[in-house]
Amino acid sequence: MGGRNVGRAAALRARSVAFPSVAGFCIATAALIVGLALAAGMARAQDLIVAHGISTFGDLKYPADFPHLDYVNPNAPKGGEISEWAPGGFDSMNPYSVKGRAAALASAPFENILTGVADEIGSAYCLLCSTLEYPADRSFVIFNLRPEARFSDGSPLTAADVVFSYKMFLTKGLTDFRTVLAQQVQGAEALDAHRVKFTFKPGVPTRDLPQDVGALPILSQAHYEANKLDLEEPGMVPFLGSGPYVLENAEAGSSVTYRRNPDYWGADLPIAKGKSNFDRIRIEYFGDSAVAFEGFKGGAYTFRNENSSRVWATQYDFPALAAGHVVKAELPSGTKANGQGFLFNLRREKFQDPRVREAIALMFNFEWSNETLFYGLYSRINSVWENSWLAAMGVPSAAEVALLQPLVDQGLLQAGILTDEPVMGPASGATQLDRRNLRRASALLDAAGWMPGGDGVRRNAAGEPLTVAFLNDDPSFERVINPYVENLKSLGVDARMESIDQAQMEARTRPPSYDFDMIVGNARSSYVSGSDLMQYYGSETADVSAFNVMGLKSPAVDRMIALVMAAKSNDDLTVATQALDRVLRAERFWVPQWFKATHTVAYFDMYEHPETLPPYALGELEFWWFNADKAAALKAAGALR
């Protein structure tokens, strides 16, 4: 696709990590620390902090008696339908298994004990619980569940369901997640019908753990057992959750529709006011983005997050837009970049040498691509935490050096990391093939023992050619990959693109297969990182992780992850994350791509949103609403069926 951003499509089709929050973050999207103030609605009882929520460092933004979130319209009307698209197909309603292809938004019916908000980083507020209790050292946490909480069939949600859900994810969750969970959580117990306690293992960093377990999706034990469901297996019978939406209809490979539960137990909670406003959320499936765009123009679905710069710049000239029936808008986004890039499969021997990876990266010409293919709409990604204060910049600070020096002394890092600026994408010229970068890449491959032969193809001492295959399941992305392939061929690399469908892509990039050379994916991160980093970049989970698809195994990265997890203040966390960013970038496990700092959206003119959007979410499915009068006008004009 002409400058696609894979994050949106991937988010719709990806299965959820075992402990997703409502805001869509993975486990440990926020962390915790001591010293939370009484002014934030907390009180001490028997040496426990009792609170309506928890914050990483400092006070919570919202007090215990807040009426609603600042960024919602508490009087937003309920009704109508919003529809979007997803690529490929699906054959399962289980978002927590690597088997099968889960439907888009399959985790939407489930709620967490705690939930994040879109205008505050590092916080979580009670949702299924009314309060939580924890000691200053966070060695355990007790959640006081709301007695009124109900599953969507009306049955009560109890502490027994929480313990059951924990045990299911511990024994049947994604392998990388349960590996991390088993290292950190000693156990869960129901103290009574509405009190559940999680105890953490001694000696592990506990800063994140109350919020980690608070992000547990809660499943109905009775429904699970009565239907003989299995968290590890795909299936079209969904688990029973307590959320505001339930599955209405699923046509495998075609569409999936969720309807708002009119009897949703939590509708009047302050945390829920002004949210979940649509009666229905429908996802239509298409083979690729080009076909999906034609469907949008014809009204097959009504809201489109445009991830193609080419389409955005050249193809929004259809009749519905000209007639004012469709709104085309760029809305502000304060979020960091999603880490999109070409990912190496580091399990392949040919990619073990960082000089090879650096040489291949030199052949991607971002500047030419942005001007020629992307209409100048993108900025380059350099950092795993691009477009945030967590990105490493300039030479390391003294505080960063203090963290990095021991790793250099132990031979885990090159000494240059202490004095050099972080690894940046190579600057390239205006022509597709930058000759200066070609010479640099040639020297690197020569030094790595990959020498050009009489046919121009580089081979190692054993006579094996240097081959690079790009797996691609999006036809519109071919025009991005093909020039890269041509540049690599000029370097003597036997490069090619291998086109496959979405089902094949998922099968070949999941554990234990990992059958690829390079793919387009994401270097994941969160604003307040913790044990999620072990899933994304940790050595221990590299061969079982659904997220560390590149197979990164680095003792230096592991040590830095431990320092991030152990940070005791906001300043310490920032410094440790910036230092980790330097180390990750030095590993050269990816060829970073691009991002834009706005939401480019188009939608039929029957949706409305708060005047000021929150910085960390577009929220069209969460807190936008439906204007029935505008919808009727569109139908009267023949713009919608």
Enumerate the language-model features and the residues they cover.
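Extracellular/periplasmic solute-recognition and catalytic clefts
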Residues: 187-189, 248-259, 284-348, 355-359, ...
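Detector for C-terminal structural segments
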Residues: 24, 47, 86, 90, ...
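Surface-exposed binding/hinge segments that line
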Residues: 144, 179-227, 242-251, 394-410
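Aromatic- and charge-enriched surface segment that lines or borders ligand/interaction sites
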Residues: 71-77, 98-105, 131-175, 189-191, ...
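Ligand-site clamp/hinge motif
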Residues: 146, 233, 266-317, 358, ...
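N-terminal lobe/hinge region of extracytoplasmic solute-binding protein
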Residues: 45-137, 144, 167, 174, ...
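Gly/Pro-rich hinge or "lid" segments in bacterial periplasmic/extracellular proteins
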Residues: 61, 89, 107-122, 213-282, ...
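Aromatic-rich, solvent-exposed beta-strand/loop patch
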Residues: 126-130, 152, 157, 199-219, ...
